[in-house]
Structure formats: structure tokens, C-alpha cells
Amino acid sequence: MVKLAKGAKTQAKPKKAAPPPPKDMEDSEEEEDMEEDDSSDEEVEVPVKKTPAKKTATPAKATPGKAATPGKKGATPAKNGKQAKKQESEEEEDDSDEEAEDQKPIKNKPVAKKAVAKKEESEEDDDDEDESEEEKAVAKKPTPAKKPAGKKQESEEEDDEESEDEPMEVAPALKGKKTAQAAEEDDEEEDDDDEEDDDDEEEQQGSAKRKKEMPKTIPEAKKTKTDTASEGLSIFIGNLNSTKEFDELKDALREFFSKKNLTIQDIRIGNSKKFGYVDFSSEEEVEKALKLTGKKILGTEVKIEKAMAFDKNKTAENKKERDSRTLFVKNIPYSTTVEELQEIFENAKDIRIPTGKDGSNKGIAYVEFSNEDEANKALEEKQGAEIEGRSIFVDFTGEKSQNSGNKKGPEGDSKVLVVNNLSYSATEDSLREVFEKATSIRIPQNQGRAKGFAFIEFSSAEDAKDAMDSCNNTEIEGRSIRLEFSQGGGPQGGGRGGSAQSKTLFVRGLSEDTTEETLKEAFDGSVNARIVTDRDTGASKGFGFVDFSTAEDAKAAKEAMEDGEIDGNKVTLDFAKPKGDSQRGGRGGFGRGGGFRGGRGGRGGGGGRGFGGRGGGRGRGGFGGRGGGGFRGGQGGGFRGGQGKKMRFDD
């Protein structure tokens, strides 16, 4: 730095012979000193700088330095300044302290002090200095274009500002014109940059608005799909050839109906490609299309029905009214046909026997009558009637079923017993030998194999209680059975039967077009249905829940709809679990929570995956129960829990 200072001295000597500048120059220099002192709030050495500046402000010596001072940020185009900047930028950080001491004998001592002071100021508050200097530049000289150029240079190289102080003392004042031209060009470039920034901001704001508007348009699109259906101008087409592509199906449907001189407004194919909806322009065309059911499209016979448009209140009333005149019949032989049931229920308006994949019935049926009085009469007359040696059980569906059949007895006990620990080889006949008063016996099976338990139904709670007292721990097919009351009633309650006695079914695999009304309509005896939808789009998530008045109705509906279809989609059924009846977490130890595999937390398990792992990683496992967490901590954190931070241990 001493060499550079000497170089500055030698280059400044030829300027001593130059004629003294006009007096205006000296005045402007003093004004600049005053303005520079005012522009910096943190410059402590202000009085020291002002006094020597006035003493040494001789025309020959101070003119180059003072002319260069405002050019500190604006005259960077000077060649000498760039070369000196490159040399100093490598050593400025290490030699900043030496620079102040080495420059004491130099005649331009006030200028050096200013450079050091400005270096300290630029490190502490570059942004404030930029703003203040930019504002002061307007009132300084007749050449204010130098300051904006300095601002641009400073914004690009803020960290290298101090390196420009001394080189500018060497820069001759004669190059001020070139600097002004460069500054004007920089002003134009800055204006262009500002315009481009404004354009970018407008584009970003516009794109953000478009993104916000996107979710709003989705529900509107969904509404238009159902508009035609609500007007009764849509048909439902089932049993489509799902092996074809969506476009193939649409083209085939369009060609099929156009040959029949029918005008199509829109075609919608379900995700499974097994069904679709076709909109027409008039009711007359819909009636013509309905007559085409059973015709082949792409090699399969299609089923054509009128698309349902539901009035929620009206549908609920119709459902309740129909349930009041519909009977639910259980314990019928698997070979029973509709004709055989028609012989027993002579006044029945409609009889439905749910069937499985193999076409055989599931031991239940629904019998609908013209009015509620006929249903009541049939219930009284046909209760316990025999079909092929089996005594049938008759009850109402829906809400009315609570008044008869499966209701609890006067003492609050259930009329249904659950038989646990049942031999897999046990049959209905072997159970009937033990439970002689049973009105219905059902052995749930999985792929033709018994599940190890059964349901025994009696005509009264008293009969069920007697069977519990006399038959519990009886041996059937070599195994001692264990009895309990269904629906959590009786001395033992709960158990497998209690957990299975849910009144709500969980339905998966629903079509995106299935509504809560169609879902409820699909299950005889249901009292309510709800479909889970996406909060943002309102679209169905493909699953829902169906509520029943009793657990027995839910079980019967599950059996009836097993492997069934709703709106062309095959659905999967299961009993819904009450909230809080979850098995997450386990009970620590070597079980589902803690242990060697960790589980999901547990209660004081032994960690898992070494010391803590998954078992203690959620604040309830590890070595110390709550907040344990082992070495890895997780949310519990370390040995003592703490605030949820992981703790490190050095090797």
C-alpha cells in the first residue's frame, strides 16, 4: 500500500505545474466536503476532516483529490482506477490497518483519512449510504450524472467499495467528460432495468391471479356436468367394454346413437371405463335411447337407464316411506328362489334376493309391499315360517326395525349371542343341536372356510339369556365354545361380537359420479349416507359411510352388497371403526409399540432400531416412557425429552 501511495504522489507531481483552477473550483470543493460530512450520520471524525481540508486545499494539490472524491463512485470507467482497483482488492482486507499508518507522510493526508473513514462506514451501513449519497447528488455539481453511475457500481460491488478510494486520487480530472458520458449511458440502462422489473412484477401478479382463479373454475365445471342430468336429459350406460380406451368408448357411443338419429350433447366416461353418461337435447331422444338397452357396443351388451336426478328432501321421504313397507327376511336356505318366497309372501310387490359371485343367494331377502299395513300383517303371520326345514326371521328395514326383531329385550340384553372359539368344521346343524330355541344361526365364512365364530339369534332376550347360562363352555366339534352377548350386552359384553357390531359401513371404490343419495339407495335399510370429498375441489375421494339403525341391519346389508356394484363400480365393504378405537401405538415392550421394531411410539417401550429408533421417536417410547426417545430422540428428544431437539453424542 506504501508503493501505491508513492505512485500516487509521483503521478500527481506533473499537476503541480498546471495553472491554478478558478476560484469557483475551490468553493465547490468546500461545499462538497460539507455535503459529504452531512450525508453520513456515523462519521465520527467530521471536525478533524473539515479542518485539514481547508488548510491543505491548495489549488495544485487538492484539485485532483477533490475532483476524484465525488468520482469515487462515478468515475470507475477511468483506466487507471480499474487497474489500481484490481491490485488493491487482493490486499485491502489484510492491509487496511497498515494503509492508515503508511499514508501519514503523504501530502494529501486529509484525503487518506477520508478514505479510511468511508471504508468503515461502508462496512457498517452500505445501504443507508447509498440512499443518502444518491439524494445529495442532485444538489452537488452541474454534472449530477456521476452519482447514479456510482450507485449502480456500488450495488454491483458493495464489498469492494473501499478499494476505489485511493485509485481515484491518481485518476486525472481531465477524464470527467468520459465519466459523464458513461454515467448517462448507465442512467439509460437503469431506466430500462426499472421498466423490465415493472413488467416482471406485473407478469408475476397476473400469474398469481390466474392461479387463484383456477380452483374457482373447477366447481363450475362440475356443476355443468350435472345440469343436464338434473333436467332429466341424461342416461346412464353400464357394462361398457373397459378394455377399450376412453376415446374409443366415446367414439363408439357417438356412432351408435347417431345411427339411431339421436343428437348427443355430451359424453362422460367413468374412471373405471365400465359406465358412462350421455346427455341429449330433448326428453323425446332420452326415451328413444332407453329402448336401446341390451344392445351391443364394442362387443358387450350395455345396460341403459335414466340418470337419476335427486331432490334431497324428496329422496329421504321416499326412502323412509319405502322402508316402512319393506321386510327383511333372514335365515332362508341358500337355494331359495324368488318364486318360492313369492308363495310365502303372496301380497309382496317386489322381492329381491342378493347374490354372490357364483349366483347363489346369501341367506337373506328383501320383500316389499304396496303399503305399510300389508307389511305389518305379513310380519305377524310369517314370522318363524319354515322354508325347506329352516325357520325364517322377519323384520322391518330402516328406522322401523328398532320396534321389532333385533331390538334389545326389556332388561337391555341382546337377543343375539356370539359363539367364539368355534371349530372350523362346525356346521349350522351341529350348532342347532346345542341351541334348540335359536331362530337364526349364521356362521360367517371367508372363501368357503368358517371364521371360527357364529351368531345365534333367539326370539326373545330371555331365551338368549337361558342359552348363555346353559350352553357356555359347551364342547362342539371337539372345542369348548365361549359365549357372549352381541352389541356389548350381557355379563361379558364386548369381545369379537361387540367390535363387529358397528351400525356404520365403510364403503370403498365409489365412482366419482356416485352421490350420497345413490349410495344410500344402494343399501336397503340404511338411514344415512355420506361421501368424503376434497375440500378444495369438492370432488369425491372414492369412499364413504352408510349408517343403519341397528348393527344387525348393517351386517345384513354388508352381506347383501358383498362384491356388489354401485354406479358400475365394484365396491368393498367393511365395518366402520368408532373414533378413538385405533390400534396405533400399541402397549410398548416387544409388542406393536417399542420393542425391537419400535412400532409407533407405545408407552415406555424398549426403543427400537438400536436405542430409541421408531419406538421412542414420538415422545412416548425410549427408556423413560414419556419424553424418552433413546439416543435418537425424535420428538421426545434425548434421554430426558427436553424440547423436541435431537441430541448428538461425540464418538
UniProtKB/Swiss-Prot annotation:
InterPro entries: Euk_RNA-bind_prot, Nucleolin_RRM1, Nucleolin_RRM2, Nucleolin_RRM3, Nucleolin_RRM4, Nucleotide-bd_a/b_plait_sf, RBD_domain_sf, RRM_dom. Residues 26-45, 89-101, 122-134, 155-168, 183-204 have a biased composition (Acidic residues). SUPFAM superfamilies: RNA-binding domain, RBD (SSF54928). One of its GO terms (biological process) is 3'-UTR-mediated mRNA stabilization. Residues 585-644 have a biased composition (Gly residues). Residues 106-116 have a biased composition (Basic residues). It is found in: Nucleus, Nucleolus. Residues 233-309, 325-399, 415-488, 503-578 form the RRM domain. PROSITE patterns: RRM. Keywords: DNA-binding, Methylation, Nucleus, Phosphoprotein, Repeat, RNA-binding. The modification Phosphoserine is found at S155. Residues 219-228 have a biased composition (Basic and acidic residues). It holds the Pfam family RRM_1. Residues 1-230, 574-651 are annotated as: Disordered. It comes from the Eukaryota. One of its GO terms (cellular component) is nucleolus. GO terms for molecular function: DNA binding; mRNA binding. Residues 1-11, 54-79 have a biased composition (Low complexity). PANTHER family: OS02G0815200 PROTEIN, RRM DOMAIN-CONTAINING PROTEIN. Nucleolin is the major nucleolar protein of growing eukaryotic cells. It is found associated with intranucleolar chromatin and pre-ribosomal particles. It induces chromatin decondensation by binding to histone H1. It is thought to play a role in pre-rRNA transcription and ribosome assembly. This is Nucleolin. The gene is ncl.
